Amino acid sequence: MAKVFHLLFLVFFFSSCKSTTYYLSRHAERAGTMSNDPQLTAEGQKQALDLRDYLRGKNIKGIYSTNFARTKATAQPTSEWYSLPINLYSPNGASSMIDSLKATNKNNILIVGHSNTVDDLVNRLTGANSMTDLPETEYGSLFIVKKKGGNYRFEKIKVPQTTPR
């Protein structure tokens, strides 16, 4: 009986230490057209490949994007690398999407958004208002939120350039 109790304790302990990492990115550089749904520039396409290269060893299990050409094109190389579909979400429904992801405890998620939504997503995940809207000129940053147990850690990095310029 003591062995069973000890085994159950270890299973519970290690399952509660399970970590989840959310990788949040603003879409890559978009074309400066008058379109409501612009494509990525050539530089933006390279940034999307850089993001894929950075995420290659991260064991991504889910990919989420808004239904805009620029966000889907940013997520596409990672989607193809992992053979995962791009799950679409509404920028207006991002809070409920985050709540659903937190409830499922799905590991290693990529979420692609916009300059005025990435901050909201990070704040919703961490439960703090640590971020504000990104500058319109900021591309190539990756916001990493790690959950271990009930604690969240947040860091911002610049995605390394791996694609020839």
Predicted regions and their residues:
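Sec-dependent signal peptide recognition
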Residues: A2-L8
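A conserved hydrophobic position in a structured secondary element of the catalytic/binding core
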Residues: F9, G113
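C-terminal motif of bacterial Sec signal peptides marking the signal peptidase cleavage site
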Residues: F13-S16
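Active-site-proximal alpha-helix that buttresses catalytic centers in soluble enzyme cores
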Residues: S19-K106, V118-L121, A128-M131, P135-L142, ...
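Periplasmic-binding protein-like
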Residues: N108-V112
